[in-house]
């Protein structure tokens, strides 16, 4: 028979936050949508970021989960806010996104796979818009859309490089207008981004209508509202717009909702989930995708500005293995104090990035069994020399108990003065915004624009996008736009290859390097190790 986890009924988890049963729409005994409007925010927001990760990630999600459990052990009413996992990484390189060991969110298998169907709804809404666009072409193209200038892509929640660039509409006149097209990962779509930033249904519909999908032969932009797509898209998204409530392995509340990637979108959970968490809990721990150059930068420059959510403290997650990696060690699973010492340059840059926005980070060292005492001492000394709070985190092995010291440092940090400041004024030019991010956050010497990017920049200015904040899509495994540059690269120039106005989401996406919005699978994907036993239990997804 299928093994049932020893979990609390979701009604009991909700009761910890004062949520009554009639505010829940249940998806079985352990998952629920939260109904109604969020109460006025009263809680304090703790943002969790990290140093540049190795391909496997450094345990930012695990640390955030364990921190919430530790805060409850200290008598604090805390809630977790995370993004939903994408099937791309689940079956690709990283695996699931529900934490690991004793610091997990549950029911993890359901969350990692179909969950409450939110990603299906987003995917369907994107593909409906595509279908309406292609149908418009087929039915006479009254708007005069240029098939060569269609920006919209279809969506799929799977890493499948073969679908990046395709030709559709083949087979004769009855099968549509032939044109080039492609797919992107659902979490890279503009619909996912605007779902994460919309405040209510009215705002959601306004944002959907503002999505630019193509240009006419005369160069005039065409929006989703021009295709009369908004109402049907909103209907598909109605249930998905409601935040999901689940629990940690210790039975504490976790809001998990929406999932824009940190390297190709803005990289944090939905505004609705954060507002519910902040309205119901005293402390909210929220994760920002990847490292400070991606998720944190975008949170401070885009999310905080758009939503008004401003952190009270920042946790910076580091690991010994990542420091070895950035110190030049390929076999980063073995002790190497020399490599760790060299790799501290990467940690130093991420500390500086947090400080750019007005905060002193709490350094959380996510512990692994291979960590040597000498290596740990190097990181502790680094923090002490700079007057930064430091705590080892052993939540993977010990759950909330292993995060008590970190929780204490975070509570102390909440009382420290901070002054949130964005990196650039919104009235600055798009070039100046990109230059500020590249030089001050990445450490680049300058920015180079391709001819295609220059043309896109000119069009963006003409369309009135210059007052929007910038979201950079770039490699996540380096501070630069070159994924092979480890540590703290210096003397490099980043190259802008393209630019897109995302008026629905409310930002401009700037593409750097060879970033793809639809990843491919590795030679040995995580999918090879996943199975279902004779009794229906999932195997190979316990991280």
Curated annotation (Swiss-Prot):
Reactions the enzyme catalyzes: (6S)-5,6,7,8-tetrahydrofolate + formate + ATP = (6R)-10-formyltetrahydrofolate + ADP + phosphate
Top-level taxon of the source organism: Bacteria
Keyword Heme in record: no
Record pathway: One-carbon metabolism; tetrahydrofolate interconversion
Record protein name field: Formate--tetrahydrofolate ligase
Transmembrane domains' residue ranges: none
Pfam families linked: FTHFS
Gene3D superfamilies named among the record's database cross-references: Domain 2, N(10)-formyltetrahydrofolate synthetase, Formyltetrahydrofolate synthetase, domain 3, P-loop containing nucleotide triphosphate hydrolases
Molecular function terms, GO-annotated: ATP binding; formate-tetrahydrofolate ligase activity
InterPro entries xref list: Formate_THF_ligase, Formate_THF_ligase_CS, P-loop_NTPase
Keywords: ATP-binding, Ligase, Nucleotide-binding, One-carbon metabolism
EC number: 6.3.4.3
Swiss-Prot/TrEMBL GO biological process terms: tetrahydrofolate interconversion
Binding of ATP, residues: 54-61
Class of enzymatic activity (EC top level): ligase
Family to which this protein belongs: Belongs to the formate--tetrahydrofolate ligase family.
């Amino acid at each position: 028979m299928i093994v049932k986890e020893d979990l609390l009924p979701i009604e009991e988890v909700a009761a910890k936050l004062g949520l009554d049963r009639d505010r829940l729409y249940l998806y079985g005994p352990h998952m629920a949508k939260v109904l109604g409007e969020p109460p006025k925010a009263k809680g304090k927001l703790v943002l969790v970021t990290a140093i540049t990760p190795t391909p496997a990630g450094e345990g930012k999600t695990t640390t955030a989960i364990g921190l919430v459990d530790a805060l409850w052990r200290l008598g604090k009413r805390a809630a977790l806010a995370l993004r939903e996992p994408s099937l791309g990484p689940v079956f690709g390189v990283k695996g699931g996104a529900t934490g690991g060991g004793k610091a997990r969110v549950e029911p993890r298998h359901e969350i990692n796979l179909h969950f409450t169907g939110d990603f299906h709804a987003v995917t369907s809404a994107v593909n409906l818009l595509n279908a309406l666009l292609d149908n418009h072409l087929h039915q006479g193209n009254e708007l005069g859309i240029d098939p060569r200038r269609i920006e919209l892509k279809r969506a799929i929640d799977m890493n499948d490089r073969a679908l990046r660039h395709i030709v559709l509409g083949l087979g004769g006149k009855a099968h549509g207008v032939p044109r080039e097209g492609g797919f992107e990962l659902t979490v890279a779509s503009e619909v996912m981004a605007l779902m994460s930033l919309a405040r209510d249904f009215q705002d959601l519909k306004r944002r959907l209508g503002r999505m630019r999908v193509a240009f006419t032969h005369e160069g005039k932009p065409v929006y989703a509202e021009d295709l009369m797509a908004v109402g049907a898209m909103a209907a598909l998204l109605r249930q998905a717009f409601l935040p999901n409530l689940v629990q940690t392995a210790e039975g504490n509340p976790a809001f998990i909702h929406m999932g824009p990637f940190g390297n190709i979108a803005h990289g944090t959970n939905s505004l609705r989930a954060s507002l519910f968490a902040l309205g119901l809990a005293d402390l909210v721990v929220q994760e920002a995708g990847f490292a400070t150059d991606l998720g944190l930068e975008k949170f401070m420059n885009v999310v905080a500005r758009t939503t008004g959510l401003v952190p009270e403290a920042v946790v910076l997650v580091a690991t010994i293995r990542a420091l070895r990696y950035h110190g030049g060690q390929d076999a980063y699973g073995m002790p190497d104090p020399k490599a760790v010492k060299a790799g501290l340059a990467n940690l130093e840059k991420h500390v500086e990035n947090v400080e750019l926005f007005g905060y002193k980070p709490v350094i959380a060292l996510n512990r692994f069994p291979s960590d040597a005492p000498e290596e740990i001492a190097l990181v502790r000394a680094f923090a002490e020399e700079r007057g930064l709070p430091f705590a080892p985190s052993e939540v993977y092995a010990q759950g909330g108990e292993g995060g008590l010291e970190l929780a204490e440092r975070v509570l102390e940090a909440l009382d420290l003065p901070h002054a949130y400041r964005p990196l650039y004024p919104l009235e600055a030019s798009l070039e100046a915004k990109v230059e500020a991010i590249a030089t001050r956050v990445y450490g680049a010497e300058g920015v180079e624009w391709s001819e295609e990017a220059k043309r896109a920049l000119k069009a963006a200015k003409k369309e009135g996008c210059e007052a929007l904040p910038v979201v950079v899509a770039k490699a996540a495994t380096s501070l630069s736009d070159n994924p092979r540059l480890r540590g703290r690269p210096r003397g490099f120039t980043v190259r802008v290859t393209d630019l897109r106005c995302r008026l629905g989401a409310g930002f401009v996406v700037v593409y750097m390097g060879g970033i793809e919005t639809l990843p491919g699978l590795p030679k040995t994907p995580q999918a090879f190790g996943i199975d279902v036993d004779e009794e229906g239990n999932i195997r190979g997804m316990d991280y």
